[in-house]
Amino acid sequence: MDFNAIIKRVIGIITKPNQEWETIKTESSTIADMFTKYVLILAAIPAIAGLIGNLLIGRSVMGFTIRIPFSNALIWAIMMYVMTLVALYVTAFIIDILAPSFGSQKDLVSSMKVAVYASTASWVAGIFYIIPALAILALIAGLYGLYLMFLGIKIVKSPSQDKAVGYFVVVIIVQIILYFLIGFIVSAVAFGRGAAFM
């Protein structure tokens, strides 16, 4: 595992996204490489931070703090991690399926590049889940991730210029629905059906 390469990519995609997307576009990579050398490490940050936050601080519900039992917090963290990996595949698949409709080429590797590297800001900001009250900062980073997604689609997938925004909007709508469902399922399984609405 080359942690220097991971750190370099994280800094590049967050601070110089246009440049980094151009580099990513021309990189020879496989889906397995992206997962083993990048995703498996970074996607663990929100899950581990959330586990720690749920155990040490708990969840605030209507002004009351609820301490989460270890087994529930662990189930939540494992499911969140696994579902994040599944969501990446689904997102990449959607990006790829939609490509011809927006003047782009079907290529699952380039679609996975967009899904993976656009998620970087959210994963890194997932550290804020250690203190559940700061989870809003992870949400803000997620908004920056939308910008990264737009640039990634535009640069890596190279859709028709007049269709780039539409491509991005359709992918984001699908992603919002996907992540809402994942959050609901994970919370319902880990904390019970009523907790899915917390």
Model regions and ranges:
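Juxtamembrane transmembrane-helix termini
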Residues: 22-25, 56-60, 103, 151-161, ...
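Selected alpha-helical membrane-embedding segments in polytopic membrane proteins
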Residues: 2-103
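Flexible domain-boundary/linker segments
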Residues: 27, 34-35, 61, 115, ...
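Solvent-exposed, flexible loop/coil residues
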Residues: 28, 39, 106, 112, ...
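Membrane-helix interface segments in multi-pass membrane proteins
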Residues: 46-84, 122-142, 179-198
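Hydrophobic alpha-helical transmembrane segments and adjacent short intramembrane/lumenal linkers
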Residues: 94-178
